[in-house]
């Protein structure tokens, strides 16, 4: 992928990736299975159906810190304290259930319950009791007993164990947890899938197990915990199975028993207690089903032996049969005909058409027409429209096609039609069916008078319940207050999707009497705490014994009625009545006739049979944790692993199974998502396709475990291993952390110090102003003990900020000075320090590191004799006289153009300009001159003496001497930068008398140049230090680039557009641009090296190994090892430290202590790492001996310090590469044809056609068909090559742009959006080999859109910015893989990559201004820049995770900005994308008026890494 590389920093610093959110909002964990129910089919609660959703939609790379916060947030929602007066509508589900539980919530046992409890204490038991008879209390009693025993065992030192209360729906989780909390004094936790429990790790589970004695959860949660070895059977003391009749086939109840319970020794098994109203829920042999249930649960059915006592507690209702006349055949109403004629072709309305037609017979025309009113109501219409668009988008079409917009428009028209259609009168003939009329009649009789009747009407379909509710609302039966209770279903097409909260609120209203007639589906049959009714009506007849028993159990009120509605002369209905009655009698007889000891013959054999049926399924057990992998669970484990590879906006990371017939059997190949290190596996042959699929999944899981990509709990390690590597790049701090030794001066100055030099080497220094200077500056020659290199030119700023180029010319011939010559040279050099800089040194030529002398004025060349270059006349003049003494009879013109200085005050140095005949020494100074203490006369103004000395001098001085105009020399020494405003404001015009001052023997032109010498020698010294750094690394880099790479001119140099902190003036260019270039070359060089040295590695290993090489931590460690920190220039010009060291100072301020105090500098670790990359960039700009990248290659080897990259030249890459077998194999006809076609399009001829075949082979393509590797390795290489060619182009074209601008515009050139459009433009998309129907659809639609946009754009080269994003996992990768293939095929000629760039990419980017806004102003991008650049914080992340609706509503997504483990802000939305935007926007608002210091104080931001290790940290995927 182009810029989702593992080494690219995302918004995290423990930087985690910004993880995607599961689109599946249903509860539970996935077993890899699932089914789809049409919205108008039989009612089935979807509360636990979510357990069977594919978990590949789930994200499993959550940061541990965020996960804890997310869990806490969800728990807070569910368990938040309830205010006494808080409205019911504001309560959470737990609070609603807790507040409105029937009775007080304190249960008292009855005799038969105690009897069953005693039995359950000593043996595994299935309690078969009627609904309402108190099975839950027996479970509570048993739990109390088990907890008491457990506490005793723990006190005796036994390992702790806990109890599990397993239920089959999410609503029951809430309800049973509330009951247990009201009856147990121990901690009770409740969990279900939508709480994100499938994302928890062992540590999280261990914490819950440790602090809770009982856990109420849906069964699949425990099943997965057992399979993942988060808990073992030995750690469980009791398993309670609510509604135990579900234990059959592959239900999680059955899987827990088969996969975990029966596989441990009997002595280690927990007690089992099952509860059900009937042990069977299917048609067929009742006794056989009961025995099977006993075998599956390893338990014995038990019921009370005192049924008379039970009858006293559970009132059996009076059973009635309501007979209605035979229904009419289905027909079509007028509204139906009208709707069908105009909108019958809209597939989304098909369920409504089907139900409306069926309802004409079952319910009548009023109800049939009413479904349209409900389905197309104003409040439902937006949901319908969203469902249409969402369904189309879920098929991978991306943007909505025109036909979807058309359907939405027509749906609105249909709604308007229904609204305008005159409603029928429900009392009219044929308006209601005979069945509904009977219901109306009977209910009217029950509610016609003042009564306390409570009624539940059971229907099979959701629509039926809703329409009957609407009907009885319209009929306005006296005393009737109707309501509707249906199951949770997120995919209902007509907006009838209800939430857990709505369910609970409806039951609360029913309990309080606000509703007294519920029209309900099967959701009201089982488990829910619904108060006793005195009328239960089966509008749609039950079909199984369990439905009959459970719905009858709702009629528990005294003198209640249970009515079954049957059609007159309907043999099927009459048969069901007989069958259910017979089955109940048989079941009762079975229970009553069981022997007292409840021993069933053949139980052991039955248990063995359960295991024998899965004998082929030998589990793979991990010894360290006892986690088990079975063939059945392998599919779930594999799906969970695949989902851990998914990132935001990626296509779904799903597992692909390819089943092929082989020798009268089936063999399955499993193909893992593209990002998986292991591509897949092939299973053993099997006679059934489903078995072959399990075999392949099992082998793939074993292979993943072998490569340690599944941990010891069978969870993906990606959420730990990959982000740790992704974060390596940012695993060091950007801020000041340590003090490092700094090299104050080049070691060249110390060579041969202490001896009189026998030979010296000269370097001529001349100045070339860009505009004329106000005064002449003479040339100088610098003699040193060692030869100086050729220095680059550099600017200084003289006079009134005139930019002046410093030219240096090294003289090849050495100078062997005589003793006299050396004496003259020493005298002049020391005179400069005294007169110009007020430092008087002892005359010790053996200690001088250099000699600064005047040069002759004619141009000098390198071959000149240095003796001829020196102006010996000036040296002689200076040597002969200390100063030019002022004489009263001196001609005034001799005083002009002199350098004069105040011997007593170093602030006053002047260049004399002219004599003013109009002024006298006694005249007051002109008003424009700078203010001094004595302004009465010019003579007094010119003196710096003390009071007494001043009086003496004034009494004897010459008051008739001339007055001169002079230029005051600014104290400014840092001529490497322009003047500051303060310096510019200094008044330099002055008037002086000469007598109080000293006239230097140094000519004014030479003195002027000497004033610039501190800046010049400082810059030359910096170049020499850069040269030393390069020599230490074995590099030959241009001094200009070497110094630039080592220059850090502020504390936050890397923050390109932020205000620079502690800015050092005049240091020249800093390292930031070179670091940008070097970073890119480092990525390319290490990619090539790894590709060549490890041809068999997969893309994952390449990314991880490259990250280990190029991460800042590795660069930092390597730099510290080589002591590169001492060469970094972090300080600008110093007026105190430029003087030569070691000389004996006789007069003047001593700066030696200052030099000692600046022996160290504070550097951030990241700065040191950045300098390494900048040195690579500098080496890259220095031509190599054979290839222009040679020096860059050598620099990479020097800074990464690893055997993974030890190349010394570009040629070494070629010698490292061993051609793989597939590349050399003879191509077949299709491969030759592919090369020919691609050559016609792109112009490159492949020597190895199979390389091109590999470049166009998608990872989804089965290896059995491909015969070449997929493109991942070539794409890894091509991605780095493309980055390099784009960066190099921008770097050279825009020399003044900062790295942030370069990065933003490079993003356009290498973006998936552009590369996808380019692939289509070049026609590459037609050559891709893949095996994915989703990809086929995505490529087709994207190509059509891209081609249309290109054809309509005329000459606009940025047309691609207006298209949708391309399929990310193929088209952009194709371009990069093609570049990688060309590079390898051409024997590593980078020039071929440049040719492709010039021909096919650069034409789109000649005018980069077009893309100024491409890096859009996204809140998350801005937040990232603000935190890193403005605040300098690196320890932050943006995380998002799904949480269950606080009250069972649709799941929401919570995003949080975390700074140093503090939740800065959060955002909640329906999707991860918008939640992150909200959180980012809130964070930007929060930080709006906070400066850097306040931020660091408030969030304790120091960004200091406690250690450099990256352990098993679950950090996530960067922004």
Swiss-Prot record:
Keywords: Antiviral defense, Antiviral protein, ATP-binding, Helicase, Hydrolase, Magnesium, Manganese, Metal-binding, Nucleotide-binding, Repeat, RNA-binding, Zinc. SUPFAM superfamilies: P-loop containing nucleoside triphosphate hydrolases, RNase III domain-like. InterPro entries: Dicer_dimer_sf, Dicer_dimerisation_dom, DSRM_2, Helicase/UvrB_N, Helicase_ATP-bd, Helicase_C-like, P-loop_NTPase, PAZ_dom. ATP binds at residues 129-136. One of its GO terms (molecular function) is DNA binding. Residues 1-13 have a biased composition (Polar residues). Residues 1-62 are annotated as: Disordered. Residues 1421-1489 form the DRBM domain. CDD domains: DEXHc_dicer, RIBOc. Its EC number is 3.1.26.-, 3.6.4.-. Residues 882-1001 form the PAZ domain. One of its GO terms (cellular component) is nucleus. Residues 634-724 form the Dicer dsRNA-binding fold domain. A motif (DEAH box) lies at residues 242-245. The keyword ATP-binding applies. Mg(2+) binds at residues 1275, 1373, 1376. It is an enzyme of class 3 (hydrolase). Residues 39-48 have a biased composition (Acidic residues). Residues 1026-1184, 1235-1387 form the RNase III domain. Dicer-like endonuclease involved in cleaving double-stranded RNA in the RNA interference (RNAi) pathway. Produces 21 to 25 bp dsRNAs (siRNAs) which target the selective destruction of homologous RNAs leading to sequence-specific suppression of gene expression, called post-transcriptional gene silencing (PTGS). Part of a broad host defense response against viral infection and transposons. Belongs to the helicase family. Dicer subfamily. This is Dicer-like protein 1. It comes from Aspergillus terreus (strain NIH 2624 / FGSC A1156).
């Amino acid at each position: 992928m182009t810029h989702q590389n593992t080494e690219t920093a995302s918004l995290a610093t423990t930087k985690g990736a910004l993880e995607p959110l599961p689109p599946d909002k249903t509860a539970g964990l996935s077993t890899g299975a699932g089914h789809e129910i049409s919205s108008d089919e039989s009612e089935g609660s979807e509360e636990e159906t979510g357990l069977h959703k594919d978990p590949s939609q789930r994200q499993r790379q959550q940061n541990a810190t965020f996960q804890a916060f997310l869990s806490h947030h969800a728990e807070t929602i569910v368990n938040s304290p309830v205010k006494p007066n808080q409205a019911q509508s504001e309560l959470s589900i737990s609070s609603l259930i807790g507040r409105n539980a029937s009775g007080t919530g304190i249960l008292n046992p009855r005799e038969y319950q105690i009897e069953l409890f005693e039995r359950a204490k000593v043996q595994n038991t299935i309690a078969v009791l009627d609904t309402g008879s108190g099975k839950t209390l027996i479970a509570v009693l048993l739990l109390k007993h088990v907890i008491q025993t457990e506490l005793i065992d723990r006190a005796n030192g036994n390992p702790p164990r806990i109890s599990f209360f397993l239920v089959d729906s999410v609503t029951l989780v809430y309800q049973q947890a509330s009951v247990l909390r009201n009856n147990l004094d121990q901690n009770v936790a409740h969990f279900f899938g939508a709480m994100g429990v499938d994302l928890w790790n062992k540590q999280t589970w261990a914490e819950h197990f440790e602090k809770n004695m009982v856990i109420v959860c849906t069964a699949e949660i425990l099943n997965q915990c057992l399979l993942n070895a988060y808990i073992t059977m030995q750690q469980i003391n009791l398993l309670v199975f609510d509604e135990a009749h579900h234990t059959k086939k592959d239900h999680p109840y059955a899987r827990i028993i088969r996969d975990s319970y029966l596989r441990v020794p009997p002595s280690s098994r927990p007690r089992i207690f099952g509860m059900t109203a009937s042990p069977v829920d299917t048609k067929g042999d009742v006794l056989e089903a009961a025995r099977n249930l006993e075998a599956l649960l390893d338990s014995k059915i038990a019921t009370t032996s005192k049924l008379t006592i039970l009858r006293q507690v559970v009132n059996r209702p009076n059973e009635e049969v309501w007979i209605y006349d035979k229904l009419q055949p289905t027909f079509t109403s007028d509204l139906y005909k009208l709707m069908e004629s105009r909108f019958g072709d809209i597939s989304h309305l098909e369920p409504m058409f089907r139900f409306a037609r069926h309802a004409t017979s079952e319910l009548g025309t009023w109800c049939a027409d009413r479904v349209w009113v409900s389905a197309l109501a104003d409040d439902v219409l937006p949901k319908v429209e969203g469902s249409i668009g969402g369904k189309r988008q879920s098929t991978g079409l991306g943007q909505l096609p025109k036909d979807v917009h058309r359907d939405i428009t027509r749906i609105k028209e249909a709604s308007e039609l229904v609204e305008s259609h005159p409603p029928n009168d429900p009392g009219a003939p044929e308006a209601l069916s005979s069945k509904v009329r009977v219901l109306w009649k009977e209910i009217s009789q029950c509610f016609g008078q003042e009564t306390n009747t409570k009624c539940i009407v059971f229907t099979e379909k959701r629509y039926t319940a809703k329409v009957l509710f609407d009907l009885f609302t319209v009929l306005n039966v006296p005393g009737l207050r109707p309501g509707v209770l249906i199951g949770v279903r997120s995919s209902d097409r007509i907006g009838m999707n209800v939430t857990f909260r709505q369910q609970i609120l409806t039951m609360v209203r029913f309990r309080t009497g606000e509703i007294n007639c519920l029209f309900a589906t099967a959701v009201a049959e089982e488990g829910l705490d619904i108060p006793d009714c005195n009328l239960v009506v089966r509008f749609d007849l039950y079909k199984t014994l369990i439905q009959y028993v459970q719905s009858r159990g709702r009629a528990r009120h005294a003198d209640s009625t249970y009515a079954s509605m049957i059609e007159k002369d309907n043999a099927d209905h009459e048969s069901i009545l007989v069958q259910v009655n017979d089955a109940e009698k048989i079941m009762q007889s079975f229970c009553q006739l069981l022997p007292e000891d409840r021993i069933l013959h053949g139980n052991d054999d039955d248990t063995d049979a359960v295991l024998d049926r899965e004998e082929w399924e030998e589990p793979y057990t991990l010894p360290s944790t006892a986690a088990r992998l079975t063939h059945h669970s392998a599919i779930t484990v594999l799906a969970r692993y695949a989902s851990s590879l998914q990132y935001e906006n990626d296509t779904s990371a799903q597992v692909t199974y390819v089943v092929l017939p082989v020798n009268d059997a089936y063999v399955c190949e499993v193909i893992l998502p593209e990002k998986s290190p292991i591509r897949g596996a092939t299973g053993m042959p099997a006679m059934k396709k489903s078995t072959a699929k399990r075999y392949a999944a099992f082998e793939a899981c074993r292979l993943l475990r072998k490569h340690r990509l599944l941990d010891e709990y069978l969870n993906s390690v990606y959420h730990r291993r990959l982000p740790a590597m992704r974060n390596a790049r940012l695993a060091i701090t950007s801020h000041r952390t340590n003090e490092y030794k700094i090299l104050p001066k080049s070691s060249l100055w110390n060579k041969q110090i202490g001896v009189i030099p026998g030979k010296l080497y000269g370097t001529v220094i001349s100045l070339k102003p860009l505009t004329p200077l106000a005064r002449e500056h003479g040339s100088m020659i610098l003699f040193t003990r060692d030869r100086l290199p050729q220095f680059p030119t550099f600017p200084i700023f003289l006079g009134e900020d005139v930019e002046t180029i410093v030219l240096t010319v090294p003289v090849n011939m050495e100078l062997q000075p005589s003793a006299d010559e050396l004496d003259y040279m020493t005298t002049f050099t020391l005179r400069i320090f005294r007169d110009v800089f007020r430092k008087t040194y002892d005359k010790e030529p053996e200690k001088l590191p250099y000699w600064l002398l005047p040069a002759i004025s004619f141009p000098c060349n390198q071959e000149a004799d240095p003796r001829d270059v020196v102006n010996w006349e000036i040296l002689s003049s200076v040597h002969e006289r200390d100063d030019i003494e002022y004489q009263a009879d001196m001609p005034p013109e001799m005083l002009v153009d002199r350098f004069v200085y105040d011997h007593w005050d170093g602030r006053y140095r002047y260049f004399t300009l002219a004599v003013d005949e109009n002024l006298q020494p006694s005249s007051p100074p002109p008003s424009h001159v700078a203010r001094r203490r004595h302004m009465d006369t010019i003579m007094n103004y010119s003196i710096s003496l003390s009071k007494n000395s001043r009086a003496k001098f004034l009494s004897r001085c010459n008051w008739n001497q001339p007055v001169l105009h002079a230029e005051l020399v600014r104290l400014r020494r840092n001529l490497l930068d322009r003047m500051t405003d303060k310096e510019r404001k200094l008044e330099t015009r002055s008037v002086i008398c000469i007598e109080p001052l000293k006239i230097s023997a140094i000519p004014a032109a030479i003195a002027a140049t000497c004033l610039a010498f501190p800046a010049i020698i400082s810059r030359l010294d910096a170049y020499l230090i850069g040269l030393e750094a390069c020599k230490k690394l074995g590099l030959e880099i241009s001094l200009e680039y070497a110094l630039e790479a080592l220059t850090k001119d502020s504390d936050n140099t890397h923050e390109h557009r932020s205000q620079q902190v502690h800015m050092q003036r005049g240091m020249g260019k800093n390292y930031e641009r070179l670091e940008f270039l070097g970073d890119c070359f480092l990525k390319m060089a290490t990619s090539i090296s790894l590709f060549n040295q490890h041809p068999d590695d997969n893309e994952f290993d390449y990314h991880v190994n490259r990250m280990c090489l190029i991460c800042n931590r590795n660069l930092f460690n390597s730099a510290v090892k080589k002591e590169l920190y001492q060469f970094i220039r972090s300080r600008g010009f110093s007026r105190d430290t430029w003087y030569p060291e070691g000389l004996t100072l006789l007069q003047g301020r001593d700066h030696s202590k200052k030099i000692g105090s600046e022996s160290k500098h504070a550097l951030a670790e990241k700065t040191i790492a950045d300098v390494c990359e900048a040195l690579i960039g500098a080496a890259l700009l220095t031509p190599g001996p054979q290839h222009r990248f040679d020096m860059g290659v050598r620099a990479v080897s020097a800074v990464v310090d690893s055997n993974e990259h030890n190349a010394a030249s570009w040629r070494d890459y070629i010698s490292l590469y061993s051609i793989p077998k597939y590349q050399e194999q003879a191509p077949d006809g299709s491969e030759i044809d592919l090369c020919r076609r691609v050559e016609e399009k792109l112009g490159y001829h492949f020597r190895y056609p199979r390389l091109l075949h590999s470049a166009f082979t998608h990872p989804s393509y089965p290896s059995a068909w491909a015969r070449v590797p997929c493109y991942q390795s070539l794409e890894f290489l091509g991605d780095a090559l493309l980055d390099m060619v784009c960066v190099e182009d921008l770097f050279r074209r825009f020399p003044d742009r900062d790295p942030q601008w370069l990065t933003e515009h490079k993003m356009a050139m290498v973006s998936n959006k552009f590369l996808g459009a380019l692939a289509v433009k070049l026609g590459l998309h037609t050559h891709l080999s893949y095996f994915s129907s989703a990809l086929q659809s995505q490529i087709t639609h994207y190509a059509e859109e891209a081609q249309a946009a290109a054809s309509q754009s005329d000459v606009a080269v940025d047309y691609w910015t207006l298209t949708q994003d391309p399929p990310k996992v193929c088209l952009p990768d194709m371009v990069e893989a093609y570049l990688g293939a060309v590079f390898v095929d051409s024997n590593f000629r980078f020039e071929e990559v440049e040719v492709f760039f010039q021909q096919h990419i650069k034409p789109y980017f000649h005018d980069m201004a077009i893309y100024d806004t491409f890096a859009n102003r996204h809140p998350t991008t801005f937040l990232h820049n603000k935190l890193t650049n403005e605040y300098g914080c690196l320890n932050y992340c943006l995380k998002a995770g799904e949480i269950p609706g606080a009250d069972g509503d649709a799941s929401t997504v919570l995003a949080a900005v975390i700074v140093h483990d503090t939740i800065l802000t959060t955002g909640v939305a329906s999707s991860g994308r918008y939640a992150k935007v909200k959180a980012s926007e809130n964070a930007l608002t929060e930080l709006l008026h906070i400066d850097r210091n306040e931020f660091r104080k408030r969030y304790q931001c120091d960004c200091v890494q406690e250690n450099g290790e990256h352990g098993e940290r679950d950090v996530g995927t960067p922004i």
